[in-house]
C-alpha cells in the first residue's frame, strides 16, 4: 500500500480492472432481484459539465449501493444525439453535424470513464444512428395505421433566422430563445400523435407514481389540465353557430360579448371586407406568446361587426377578435363575463363594454366589482329561473336546460394538445411517410425502413440539406413515383423510448418483450426538473403506446424519480465600453472576503475591478462553468464525486466551492492514513462481544448506529449528504479510538471495513484499494454491511445532573436503572452535594435516560 493517497495511479488501475472484468455488464437473471437505475442521457455537446457530473454521480451511487444489496443492477448510458446545436456547430465550424457529433461522443465517453461510472457499455447507443431510429420510424407507421397519427395544417411559431418551428415555451418576449430574432406565425402542414387520446389515463396514473416528487406530478396535472364544463352554441346572425367552452356555466346570464381567436374561421370571414380588422388579426398572429404570459400581457381586441345571440335569454352581444383567446384551446372562442372573470373585466373596461354581475358572495357580504371582477363561486341573482342557486346546482341546471334545447352539452376538456412531432430541421430522424402523385399520403413499408438520413452533407445555415436536395426526396411507392417527407422528428421522440431500448439494444424489433419486461419499469430515474412537462410526459405516453402494442406489461416507465438541483458557481463581470457585460471566468478572478466569507472586492487577472453577480447556475453564457476534467486531474475522480454528493442535498442547488473540494480530498487522505496504519499492524482477530469493555461497546455502538443511519439515508431518504456526514463523524471517533488491545483492533477492523464499504458507492476507486489493504477481495461483489441490533442496545447510560439548571455532574448508570435509583445516585454525588448543602430540595425532575434536574433554594 502506497504511503500517500495518489488518486491518479489508483483510479487508472481500478478502471482497467472494471473494463477487463466487464464488472458492470449484466444480463437477465430470473433468480436475482433486478434494479434498473438510469440517469437522463446526455446530449453530446463536446464536454461534460458539472451538471452532468452531478446527475451521473447520483445515479452511480444508487447503482453501486443496490449492487451491494445483492441485486442484479443495470446502469446503461447512451447519447441523445440529434438536435439543433449540432447544426449550429456544423455551420460555425464548416463541417457536417454527424462527424461533429461522433467526435464529441468519443471525447465525452472518455470523460465518463475517467469519473469511474459503472456503466454497462455493451448497451451504449447514439440516437442518430439508423440502427436506433429505424425502430422509431417503424413504430410511427404502426401508430399511423392504428389511427393515432395524423397530419394537419397548424399555425406555428417560426424563427426566420433558424428556419425552424419553436414551441410556445421557446418564445421569449416575442423572440426566439436562441437567437433573439422576432418570431413570426406560419401555417404549415405537420404530423401529430394523438396524446390527447391518453390524457385521462396520463392524469389518473400520476396517482400510481408514489416515488415521484409531488411538484413534478402537480406540474403534469396542470399541463394536462383537465376541466369539466359545458360546450354551448351562440347563434351568429347570417353565419354558422359559434361554439364556446366554459367551466363556469353558472355565469352565463352575465355574458356581454364573445371573444374569438385571431385564427378563428369567423375572424377570417369578418376581415374579408375590413382591412383594419385584417391588419389587427395579422398583428395578433405574429405576437403569439407562451400561455404563462397571457395573464400579464396587454389585452387587445377589435369588433368584428358580427352579433351573437345569447342561447338562453336571446340578448344580442358583440363578437370581438381578442388577443388573449387561443385557437388551440377549447374551441378558439370564449363567452366573456366581465363581472366574474378578471381578463374579461380588463378587456370590457378598456373597450367600454357592459359589465353585468350575476353572482354574489354566498356569505351575504356585499358584492363589489368597481375595481376588479368577482371571480369566486357564489349565489346566482338576476339570472331568471336560476336565481338563488349555488355553483354546482346552477352548473347542473343551466347545463340541463342547454342540453334540453339542443344548445349545449356537458363535456370534459383538456389543456393538453396533441403532440406535434414535425421539425423543419435536418439533424433528426426522417419521418417515414411519402406522398404519391395523386396527393395520397402513405407510410413507408417496413421492408424499406430505415429511411436513412444522409450524413455527408453541406450545411448553409438556412435550408435543411434534405429539403435543398430535390433528388433525396424522390422515391417510389408500389412502383409509382412519390416524394419523401422532408421534415424530421422532434428530438423528444428519440428520448421518449430510449430507456426501453437499453433493455435489448441489439433486438431485431423496437424491443424484445421478454428482456424489456424483466428490466422495466426503471426503478430509479434521475434528471432535471426542467423536463417535468415535456420529456417525462412524452415518455409516459410512449410507454403506454408500447404497452398497447404488446411490447411491455407495465403502465408506467419510471417507478422513482429524483430531480437533482442545479450546480451554481460565483459569476463575475465588468462593463465594456458599450455598457454590455463581459463575463470573467471565476478562475481568472482574485477575491477578498470579509470575516463571514462574503466577497467584498474582486479583480480579474488584468487588475480590473469586476462585479460579483452572486452564485448563479453554471453556464457558458456567464463564463462561470468549472471544467470537471481539470478537477479530476487535480484531485481525482473520487474527490469530485464525494464533494458532489456531500455539498448539498441531491434535490437542492449545489454551490461550487473549491475549498469544499479540498476538504473532501483531505477527508479521503485521512481515511487512507488510518487504514494504512491499521493494515500495517497485520490481521486483526474477530470481535468478541462478550469480552468488550464499556468504552469498546460504546465505540462499536457508534459504528452500528452509523451503518443503520447511512443505510436508511441512502436507501429510503436519499439524503446522501447526511449519510456522508455520519461517516465523517464516525471517522473522527475512530481516529481517536485506542488501538492497544486485540479487541480495540478488532473493533477498528470491523469499523474500517464498514466505512470503506459505505464509501464504495460514492468513492469506488479508493474503496477498492482500501478493501484489498484490509485483506478482503473484490469489493464490487461485496455485501453492504448489516448493523447488529444487539450492538445498539446500551448496557449503561450517561445522565446529566443539573442543580438549578446548571451542569454539576454526569452519572453512569445501568440502562434499566429506575427513577428512584438515579435520584439517589444524583442527590448523593459529592459534586452535587457541594451545591445543595444547606438548601431545601424543592423539586427533582427526571427525563428518563438523559437528565436529572434538582431545584433547590
Swiss-Prot record:
GO terms for molecular function: aminoacyl-tRNA deacylase activity; ATP binding; leucine-tRNA ligase activity. One of its GO terms (biological process) is leucyl-tRNA aminoacylation. Keywords: Aminoacyl-tRNA synthetase, ATP-binding, Cytoplasm, Ligase, Nucleotide-binding, Protein biosynthesis. ATP binds at residue 620. It catalyses: tRNA(Leu) + L-leucine + ATP = L-leucyl-tRNA(Leu) + AMP + diphosphate. Its EC number is 6.1.1.4. It is found in: Cytoplasm. A motif ('KMSKS' region) lies at residues 617-621. A motif ('HIGH' region) lies at residues 42-52. GO terms for cellular component: cytosol. It is an enzyme of class 6 (ligase). It holds the Pfam family Anticodon_1. CDD domains: Anticodon_Ia_Leu_BEm, LeuRS_core. Belongs to the class-I aminoacyl-tRNA synthetase family. This is Leucine--tRNA ligase. It comes from Vibrio parahaemolyticus serotype O3:K6 (strain RIMD 2210633). The gene is leuS.
Amino acid at each position: 500500500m502506497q504511503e500517500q493517497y495518489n488518486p491518479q495511479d489508483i483510479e487508472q488501475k481500478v478502471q482497467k480492472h472494471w473494463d477487463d472484468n466487464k464488472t458492470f455488464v449484466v444480463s437477465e437473471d430470473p433468480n436475482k432481484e433486478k434494479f434498473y437505475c438510469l440517469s437522463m442521457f446526455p446530449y453530446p455537446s463536446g464536454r461534460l459539465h458539472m451538471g452532468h457530473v452531478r446527475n451521473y454521480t447520483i445515479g452511480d451511487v444508487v447503482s453501486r449501493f443496490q449492487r451491494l444489496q445483492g441485486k442484479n443492477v443495470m446502469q446503461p448510458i447512451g447519447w441523445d444525439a440529434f438536435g439543433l446545436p449540432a447544426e449550429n456547430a456544423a455551420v460555425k465550424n464548416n463541417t457536417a453535424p454527424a462527424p461533429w457529433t461522433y467526435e464529441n461522443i468519443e471525447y465525452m465517453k472518455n470523460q465518463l470513464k475517467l469519473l469511474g461510472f459503472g456503466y454497462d457499455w455493451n448497451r451504449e447507443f447514439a440516437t442518430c444512428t439508423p440502427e436506433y431510429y429505424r425502430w422509431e420510424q417503424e413504430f410511427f407507421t404502426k401508430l399511423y395505421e392504428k389511427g393515432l397519427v395524423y397530419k394537419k395544417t397548424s399555425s406555428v411559431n417560426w424563427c426566420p433566422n433558424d428556419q425552424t418551428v419553436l414551441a410556445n415555451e421557446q418564445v421569449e418576449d416575442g423572440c426566439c430563445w436562441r437567437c433573439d430574432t422576432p418570431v413570426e406565425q406560419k401555417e404549415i402542414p405537420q404530423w401529430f400523435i394523438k396524446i390527447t387520446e391518453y390524457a385521462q389515463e396520463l392524469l389518473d396514473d400520476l396517482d400510481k407514481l408514489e416515488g415521484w416528487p409531488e411538484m413534478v406530478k402537480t406540474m403534469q396535472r396542470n399541463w394536462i389540465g383537465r376541466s369539466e364544463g359545458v360546450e354551448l352554441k351562440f347563434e351568429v346572425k347570417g353565419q354558422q353557430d359559434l361554439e364556446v367552452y366554459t367551466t363556469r356555466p353558472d355565469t352565463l346570464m352575465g355574458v356581454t360579448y364573445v371573444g374569438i381567436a385571431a385564427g378563428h374561421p369567423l375572424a377570417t370571414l369578418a376581415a374579408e371586407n375590413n382591412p383594419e380588422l385584417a391588419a389587427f388579426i395579422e398583428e395578433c398572429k405574429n405576437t403569439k406568446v407562451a400561455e404563462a404570459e397571457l395573464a400579464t400581457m396587454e389585452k387587445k381586441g377589435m369588433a368584428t361587426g358580427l352579433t351573437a345571440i345569447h342561447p338562453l335569454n336571446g340578448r344580442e352581444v358583440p363578437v370581438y377578435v381578442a388577443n388573449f383567446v387561443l385557437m388551440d384551446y377549447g374551441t378558439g372562442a370564449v363567452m366573456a363575463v366581465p363581472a366574474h372573470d378578471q381578463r374579461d373585466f380588463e378587456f370590457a373596461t378598456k373597450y367600454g363594454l357592459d359589465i353585468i354581475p350575476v353572482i354574489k358572495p354566498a356569505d351575504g357580504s356585499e358584492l363589489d366589482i368597481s375595481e376588479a371582477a368577482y371571480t369566486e363561486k357564489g349565489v346566482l341573482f338576476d339570472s331568471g329561473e336560476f336565481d338563488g342557486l349555488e355553483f354546482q346546482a346552477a352548473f347542473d341546471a343551466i347545463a340541463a336546460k342547454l342540453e334540453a334545447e339542443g344548445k349545449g352539452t356537458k363535456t370534459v376538456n383538456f389543456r393538453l394538445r396533441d403532440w406535434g412531432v414535425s421539425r423543419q430541421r435536418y439533424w433528426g430522424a426522417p419521418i417515414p411517410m411519402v406522398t404519391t402523385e395523386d396527393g395520397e399520403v402513405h407510410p413507408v413499408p417496413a421492408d424499406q425502413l430505415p429511411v436513412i438520413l444522409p450524413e455527408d452533407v453541406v450545411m448553409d445555415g438556412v435550408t435543411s440539406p434534405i429539403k435543398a436536395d430535390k433528388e433525396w426526396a424522390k422515391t417510389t411507392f408500389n412502383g409509382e413515383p412519390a416524394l419523401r417527407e422532408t421534415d424530421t422528428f422532434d428530438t423528444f421522440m428519440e428520448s421518449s423510448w430510449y430507456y426501453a431500448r437499453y433493455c435489448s439494444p441489439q433486438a431485431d424489433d423496437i424491443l424484445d418483450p421478454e428482456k424489456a419486461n424483466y428490466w422495466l419499469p426503471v426503478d430509479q430515474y434521475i434528471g432535471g426538473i426542467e423536463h417535468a412537462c415535456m420529456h417525462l410526459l412524452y415518455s409516459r405516453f410512449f410507454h403506454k403506446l408500447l404497452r398497447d402494442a404488446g411490447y411491455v406489461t407495465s403502465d408506467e416507465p419510471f417507478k422513482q424519480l429524483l430531480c437533482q438541483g442545479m450546480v451554481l458557481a460565483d459569476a463575475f463581470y465588468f462593463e465594456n465600453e458599450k455598457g454590455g457585460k463581459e463575463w470573467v471566468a471565476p478562475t481568472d478572478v482574485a477575491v477578498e472576503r470579509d470575516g463571514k466569507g462574503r466577497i467584498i472586492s474582486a479583480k480579474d487577472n488584468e487588475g480590473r475591478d469586476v462585479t460579483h453577480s452572486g452564485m448563479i447556475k453554471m453556464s457558458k453564457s456567464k463564463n462561470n462553468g468549472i471544467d470537471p476534467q481539470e478537477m479530476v486531474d487535480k484531485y481525482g475522480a473520487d474527490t469530485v464525486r464525494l464533494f458532489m454528493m456531500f455539498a448539498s442535498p441531491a434535490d437542492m442547488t449545489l454551490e461550487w466551492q473549491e475549498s469544499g473540494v479540498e476538504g473532501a480530498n483531505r477527508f479521503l487522505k485521512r481515511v487512507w492514513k488510518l487504514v494504512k496504519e491499521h493494515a500495517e499492524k497485520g490481521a486483526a482477530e474477530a470481535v468478541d462481544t462478550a469480552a468488550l469493555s464499556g468504552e469498546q461497546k460504546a465505540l462499536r455502538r457508534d459504528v452500528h448506529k452509523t451503518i443503520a443511519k447511512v443505510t436508511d439515508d441512502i436507501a429510503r431518504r436519499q439524503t446522501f449528504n447526511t449519510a456522508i456526514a455520519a461517516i465523517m463523524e464516525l471517522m473522527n471517533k475512530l481516529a481517536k479510538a485506542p488501538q492497544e488491545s486485540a479487541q480495540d483492533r478488532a473493533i477498528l477492523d470491523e469499523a474500517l471495513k464498514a466505512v470503506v464499504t459505505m464509501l464504495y458507492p460514492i468513492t469506488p476507486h479508493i474503496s477498492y484499494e482500501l478493501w484489498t489493504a484490509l485483506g478482503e477481495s473484490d469489493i464490487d461483489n461485496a455485501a453492504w454491511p448489516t448493523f447488529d441490533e444487539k450492538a445498539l442496545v446500551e448496557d449503561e447510560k450517561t445522565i446529566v445532573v443539573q442543580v438549578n439548571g446548571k451542569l454539576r455532574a454526569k452519572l453512569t448508570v445501568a440502562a434499566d436503572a429506575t427513577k428512584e435509583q438515579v435520584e439517589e445516585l444524583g442527590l448523593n454525588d459529592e459534586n452535587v452535594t457541594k451545591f445543595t448543602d444547606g438548601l431545601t430540595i424543592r423539586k427533582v425532575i427526571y427525563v428518563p435516560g438523559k437528565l436529572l434536574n434538582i431545584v433547590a433554594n
